[in-house]
UniProtKB/Swiss-Prot annotation:
GO terms for biological process: nucleotide metabolic process. Nucleoside triphosphate pyrophosphatase. May have a dual role in cell division arrest and in preventing the incorporation of modified nucleotides into cellular nucleic acids. The active site is at D72 (proton acceptor). It is found in: Cytoplasm. This is Nucleoside triphosphate pyrophosphatase. Its cofactor is a divalent metal cation. Gene3D superfamilies: 3.90.950.10. Its EC number is 3.6.1.9. It catalyses: a ribonucleoside 5'-triphosphate + H2O = a ribonucleoside 5'-phosphate + diphosphate + H(+); a 2'-deoxyribonucleoside 5'-triphosphate + H2O = a 2'-deoxyribonucleoside 5'-phosphate + diphosphate + H(+). PANTHER family: BIFUNCTIONAL DTTP/UTP PYROPHOSPHATASE/METHYLTRANSFERASE PROTEIN-RELATED (PTHR43213), BIFUNCTIONAL DTTP_UTP PYROPHOSPHATASE_METHYLTRANSFERASE PROTEIN-RELATED (PTHR43213:SF5). It comes from the Bacteria. The keyword Hydrolase applies. Its main location: cytoplasm.
Amino acid sequence: MGTQLVLGSSSKIRKAVLEAFRIPFICVSSDFDERSITYSGDPFEYTRELAWNKANAVRSQGFSDSLIITADTVVVYEGEVFNKPESEEHAVEMLRTLSGTSHSVITSLVLMQNEKVASASETTQVSFIDIPPQHLKTYVQAFSSLKRCGGYCVQDGGGLIIKQIEGCVYNIQGLPIKTLNQLLMEFNISLWDYLA
């Protein structure tokens, strides 16, 4: 348990999820420009590449001996990737598109320490209610949708618009815990060890 864990993220949600499992870690923002990677049609490849670049950016800040954890999450609907909205209007349009439908939330994780890298992806299916059009902008303004891929957040008002979730709810929060623990075990670490 002597390895320093670094969560390469500025996401308060990812930080809160990991803190719940009592494992000691520090947060370091990767400062990687996500817009430098172009989506080529494969959301798994896209999120893995983004997560790998985030981990590499953290490693280059002097954390190569640490175990770096990075993630990238996207919403996918009918082959289109929804990242974080660029404006309130963009967030409203995303929610309008997703209203009354089902979509996928895909998170790719990368764990990196020195030259060793492990990665995996998780998919969760989310179904929305038919969101009343007059409430779209209200939701966006009430729940800081500009910081959330797809323009929504499961723990902030998600209960108003989410009809059903199939799969890992932590995945929607950007840090699928079961998958993370499986990857940590490749580095001889288990979240179970910190819960005792």
